């Protein structure tokens, strides 16, 4: 049976919104949608793998077209196959993409590679005729758990958005089955943020927990001031206080904030993850890690990151990835992560779950769809299918 990649296609799509966090607005936000087209036919249709990058980092069409897609297409197809020769080997495809790339500088490059890598894994699981989460569990010798914790990310700053709108937004998430919600902080003065937090806590009561996210906005002084304010409240976590690479700042905060903290969404390699665990003072009994495979060289690299965690005494259950996409849902279900982010009202059609999947008591159950399961989300698959045709 022939198995080869015959084309890699990319289109940059808008996911813009008038929202903002403490650091950026999303008025010009884009994503790269990628199709990895193979010559394999299943049920009368050519197998195509799909991928896209997470929000917060822009589409990477230039890098994808100029460097990474061409390297895959120029490679000897036989050198991209597994030992049996009946499927692609994602690690070999990944290695082909990274030929002549120097180490370090994990920025936009990691997003471009991660986007293609997502599409490759989608194709691999489809060729195998299995949901990706079950394929991953088999490869790692663990039992898949299709029930995955999800939390609702929102609470952005928005023109004209007062406390009543913020409360209504959070109540809407609870009405849809979520029991952990997240809001932004750091984009307003600390006393205004305190009022916003108290309004949300009053709204959700004992029905849910609240996480807050500073998006890396604070210096140490401000981060400590917020820590002293936030420790008065029973928060799910205090997220990304300062610059993602300022490990000393992160380590210093533990003295002032005994509750759970979370970070990692803007660290894009297993080396950066290792430095966070070495120098960031993260506590494996309470803190959370948010590495996002779509932004950090893909699932091939994410598996290396999980190995780093293991050597430092961390469980994969302390990982709740950023991004709100189905790829991380599959990793969570297949490899035992602690859950996944969700954007119920934002960045559509790329976020969310397959049609018919509902949140119940803060969890969803993964359907048994081949690959990542994009075909089960009709509005998203419409965009993907148009790229592949």
Curated annotation (Swiss-Prot):
Sample GO molecular function, one term: D(-)-tartrate dehydratase activity
Q: Which Gene3D superfamilies match?
A: Enolase-like C-terminal domain, Enolase-like, N-terminal domain
Q: How is the cofactor bound?
A: Binds 1 Mg(2+) ion per subunit.
Annotated phenotype, changing residue 184 to R: Reduced dehydration activity
Marked site, Transition state stabilizer, at: 55, 182, 341
Tell me what the record says results from residue 102 to A/M: Loss of dehydration activity
Q: SUPFAM superfamilies from the xrefs?
A: Enolase C-terminal domain-like (SSF51604), Enolase N-terminal domain-like (SSF54826)
Q: Which UniProt keywords apply?
A: Lyase, Magnesium, Metal-binding
Task: Give the EC number(s) listed in the UniProt record.
Answer: 4.2.1.81
Catalytic activity from the UniProt record:
(S,S)-tartrate = oxaloacetate + H2O
Which residues does Mg(2+) bind? 213, 239, 265
In the record, biological process GO terms are: D-galactonate catabolic process; protein homooligomerization
Q: Name one Pfam family in it.
A: MR_MLE_C
Which family is this protein grouped under?
A: Belongs to the mandelate racemase/muconate lactonizing enzyme family.
Q: Which PANTHER family has this protein been placed in?
A: D(-)-TARTRATE DEHYDRATASE, D-GALACTONATE DEHYDRATASE-RELATED
Q: How does it assemble?
A: Homooctamer; tetramer of dimers.
Protein name, per record: D(-)-tartrate dehydratase
């Amino acid at each position: 049976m022939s198995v080869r990649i015959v084309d890699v296609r990319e289109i940059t799509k808008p996911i813009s919104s008038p929202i903002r966090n403490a650091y950026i607005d999303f008025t010009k936000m884009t994503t790269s949608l990628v199709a990895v087209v193979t010559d394999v036919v299943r049920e009368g249709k050519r197998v195509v793998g799909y991928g896209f990058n997470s929000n917060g980092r822009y589409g990477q069409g230039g890098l994808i077209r100029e460097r990474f897609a061409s390297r895959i297409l120029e490679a000897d197809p036989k050198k991209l196959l597994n030992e049996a020769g009946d499927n692609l080997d994602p690690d070999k495809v990944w290695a082909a993409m990274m030929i002549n790339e120097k180490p370090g500088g994990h920025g936009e490059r990691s997003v471009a590679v991660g986007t293609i890598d997502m599409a490759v894994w989608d194709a691999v699981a489809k060729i195998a005729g299995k949901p990706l989460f079950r394929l991953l569990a088999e490869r790692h010798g663990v039992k898949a758990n299709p029930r995955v914790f999800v939390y609702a990310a929102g609470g952005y700053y928005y023109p004209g958005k007062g406390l009543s709108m913020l409360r209504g937004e959070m109540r809407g998430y609870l009405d849809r089955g979520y029991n952990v919600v997240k809001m932004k902080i750091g984009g307003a003065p600390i006393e205004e943020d305190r009022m916003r937090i108290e309004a949300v806590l009053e709204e959700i009561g004992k029905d849910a927990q609240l996480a807050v996210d500073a998006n890396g906005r604070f210096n140490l002084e401000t981060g400590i001031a917020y820590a002293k304010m936030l420790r008065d409240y029973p928060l799910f976590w205090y997220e990304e206080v300062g610059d993602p690479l300022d490990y000393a700042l992160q380590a210093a905060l533990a003295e002032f904030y005994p509750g759970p903290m979370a970070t990692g969404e803007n660290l894009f390699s297993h080396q950066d993850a290792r430095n966070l665990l070495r120098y960031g003072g993260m506590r494996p009994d309470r803190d959370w890690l948010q590495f996002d495979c779509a932004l950090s060289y893909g699932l091939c690299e994410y598996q290396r990151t999980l190995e780093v965690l293991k050597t430092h005494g961390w469980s994969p259950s302390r990982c709740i990835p950023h991004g709100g996409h189905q790829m991380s849902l599959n990793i969570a279900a297949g490899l035992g992560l602690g859950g996944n982010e969700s954007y119920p009202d934002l960045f559509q059609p790329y976020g969310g779950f397959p049609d018919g999947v509902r949140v119940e008591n803060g969890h969803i159950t993964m359907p048994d769809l081949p690959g990542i399961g994009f075909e089960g989300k009709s509005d998203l698959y419409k965009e993907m299918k148009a790229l592949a045709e």
